[in-house]
Regions:
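Active-site region of the double-stranded beta-helix
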Residues: 1-130, 140-168
Length: 168
């Protein structure tokens, strides 16, 4: 998931209003006009994916693990188009050699393009008391642990995978 910047929130809010989408509708993404920065403070060991790893790192990891289709797309099209491809294709074979932190996700969401996107992201482990600040626009996913989120008063969330909620 990610949260919009102020400009994205305002434009999205106005667009959805002009389309007549009710503010409480399941498919409403921009429920208000504000951005949503957040600060997360770990209360226990806390695992998350946060932002995209450098392309060279992702490419090396993909090639080392035999994720050849992912490596090919990344090499030919770059990160943005690879993410779009992964999410727009409805079914992908679950990659082999998944890192430990993604195996539970793969059980819950097998053959999801979100798994390919997750392989391109930074894996972060926070210890109790550690914190991370997430600017609007920073893609992130929480994998496990207990933490407190402090964020602005906004309900704007854009989701891409690993959820039963509306995906935009």
């Amino acid at each position: 998931q990610t949260h919009p910047t102020s400009a994205q929130a305002l434009a999205g809010f106005e667009r959805e209003n002009s389309l007549g989408i009710d503010r409480t509708a399941f498919n409403r993404v921009y429920r208000d006009k504000t951005s949503k920065p957040e600060l997360l403070c770990a209360l226990s060991d806390f695992e998350m994916l946060c932002g995209f790893a450098p392309v060279t790192e992702s490419l090396a990891r993909a090639e080392q693990n035999g994720w050849l289709e992912l490596a090919r797309h990344l090499k030919l099209t770059g990160i943005e188009k690879t993410v779009r491809w992964a999410l727009e294709e409805k079914v992908h074979k679950t990659p082999s050699n998944l890192p430990q932190h993604l195996r539970k996700v793969a059980e819950l969401y097998p053959n999801s393009g979100g798994l390919l996107v997750a392989l391109l992201m930074n894996y972060v482990v926070l210890k109790p008391g550690d914190a991370v600040y997430l600017d609007p626009g920073n893609v992130h996913s929480y994998l496990g642990g207990v933490a407190v989120e402090v964020m602005s008063s906004s309900d704007n969330v854009m989701r891409a995978a690993f959820t039963q909620k509306h995906i935009d």
